[in-house]
Amino acid sequence: MRTLSEVANKVKSLKDAARESDQRHRDVHDVRTGDIDTVIPGSMPDAWPRPVVANVIDTTARDTSEVMGQMPSINCTNSLQTSDRSKKFSSKRTKMANHYVISSRLPAGEQVKFCDHYLSFGLAVYSVEPDFERHTPILRVENPMGAYPEMDLFGRLKSYSRIWREEAVSLVAKYPQLIRVLKPQGSTGYDQDEGWAEREIEVCKYTDADQITMYLPAHSNTLIDSMPNPMGKLTISIAVRPSFDHEFRGAFDDAIWVYLAKSRMAMLGLEATEKAVRAPLAVPRDLQRMVFGGDSVLRTDNPDKIRYVGIDMPQFAAQEAQNMERELRLATRSPQSRSGNVDANIITGKGIEALQGGFDTVITTGQQVIGQALKRALEYAFEMDEKLWPNEKKTIRGVVQGAPFEENYTPSKDIGGNYLVDVAYGFAAGQDPARAIVAMLQLRGDNLVSRDFVMRQLPMEIDVVQMQTQIDNEQFEDALK
């Protein structure tokens, strides 16, 4: 095990090496939340502290992550199993894997959050942790901002560090021994006037195969807690968006600057319109008395010289706004058809298909990477369940493919060292369900693929063994009628 000093020095080195990546993450986060002034100070006037155009970065990230965040098919069976005993054993493990997913609330929005992190920051993290109240492993989606994974030459995770900020009162509630460090000398309580309870404290958690250590970097590396890793391995599964330079690059690192330019152009246009409405009034010299209001009478010998001072708008302003809109769509790889805006010139099947082509590849690539991360996380969950609660008899309940199930299992007996699980989005990943099903029916109709293959590639959650058994029973009952 490393000493606290060695851990602190290592985390500091990882943080220094990821300085540019951290800045990109902060910029994307601030743009999505509308804090433009923190990215480009002074760019927003006091009267309009927020952008006056739709936040295309945020809406695109939400739209893409909601499409990408559909749950894959999770199975522990394969088509080579022939005996009923092996099929029953694998079917039980399939229900266990789905129970882990349901208990982790992945179908209830956590998977969409994971995909959002993958798109926005180029890094998404599953942390497999034990829930000692329910006695089950949980796949927790962790915020990758401030996360520093260390990988070897082959892409395997060696250590994982994360730094975040938390209020002092929350830390003291979790770790009472920290009150001596965080509470100032002479302080008598938690009064707001003292202010220490609301201060945000920097916390670091370091994990590797040997140890789990938490400390306060800004308070002389004060140790919070440290323990040996009971699993003897990292139970962290990460999904890294492919990049050309091995950096964590999100999908919007470059697009935010186009959006900021578009927002600035819209603000200048709004300012020009306001100035045009409130333009000064030019009058001839012989006008002695100004009268304002409806049906006012102005006495002058030169009424044609009474006018508002106009502001000449550049002719290319509208064209530049359209160019920025087009560049922003290219940068985010999101077609206009996703928001319902389709140019009348391309309202054909081929036109819509061409617009969706780039979007489909984003979904397909993302689901392949995320599927592998979920597969590793479920394997860690099987191993954790067997190691921490080996002989405990458990009853699990859940819903798969719309059908509720209830199963009893003992980890040491029903897992038995077999942690393999298959996570598949299907060969038609990225397509809408209707097109995917039609393509598979065509392949099945020409006997190019087996029925088992088609069932495993369906864009929905399904227990292949249970479904096939149910189909066989229904066919047998129909034959007897």
Where are these regions (language model features)?
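A broad, low-specificity signal for short, low-complexity segments enriched in glycine/proline
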Residues: 84-90, 220, 289, 413-416
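N-terminal hydrophobic or amphipathic segments with adjacent small-residue motifs
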Residues: 63, 116, 149, 189, ...
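Intrinsically disordered, low-complexity regions of eukaryotic proteins
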Residues: 29-32, 37-39, 60, 65, ...
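C-terminal anchoring/interaction modules
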Residues: 1-16, 283-481
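Long, contiguous amphipathic alpha-helices that act as assembly "spine/axial" helices in icosahedral shell
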Residues: 30, 56-61, 69-79, 84-130, ...
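Extended, helix-rich architectural segments
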Residues: 1-178, 182, 322
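Intrinsically disordered, low-complexity, compositionally biased regions/tails
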Residues: 38, 46, 73, 150, ...
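Structured, contiguous alpha/beta core segments that scaffold functional sites
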Residues: 3, 9, 19-22, 115-123, ...
